[in-house]
Amino acid sequence: ATSVKFINNLQRQNGQPPFLQSLLNIDQTIHWADPLGQHGSTSAYAGPVPAVAHLHGAEVPSVSDGGPDAWWTPGFAQKGPGFVSDTYTYPNRQEPTLLWYHDHTLGATRTTVYAGLAAAYLLRDPNKEPGNLPGGPLDRATDRFGNTYERELIIQDRMFDTNGQWLFPSDG
C-alpha cells in the first residue's frame, strides 16, 4: 500500500487575499464546491482555490477516493461536506496498469484538468513486466545517476482561439 498526503498550496506566498486564482474562470452559476457560499453568483470567483485529488480507475477505500465533495482550501480554511482527510491510502492490489490522478473538485474538474492538474500513476508487478513489446523494449530512460525509469504519456486535448489563447467554449 502507498499513503499519500496531499497539500493544497494553491495560494499566494503570504496566504492572504487576494488569493491565487484558478487559471480558468469557475462558473459559479452551476452547482460547484463554492467555498465562500456565493451560490449562483455571476461575478468571477476570487476566493481560495478548492482542490481534492482523485486516482481515476483505482480500487481504493471510499475515504481515499477523492470524491467531488471531499475538497479543501489552503490551510483547511474551508472543507467540503465529504472531506475526511488529506492523507489517502492506495492498496495497489489491482492488476498492473496506468492510472491517472486529477483534481476532482465539484463543478471545477473540467477547468482544473484542462489547466493541467493531472498526472500519471503507474501500478507495476515485476513478475508480469513485459520484457519486450512488438516495437521493441519498453520505452525507458536513464537519469544522471544511472537509475532506469519509465516515461509516462498523458495526452490532453486543448483548443486555442485566433490569438493563441486557450479556448474553453461555454456552449456545445
For the regions a language model picked out, list residue spans one by one.
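Histidine-centered copper-binding motifs that mark active-site loops
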Residues: A1-G172
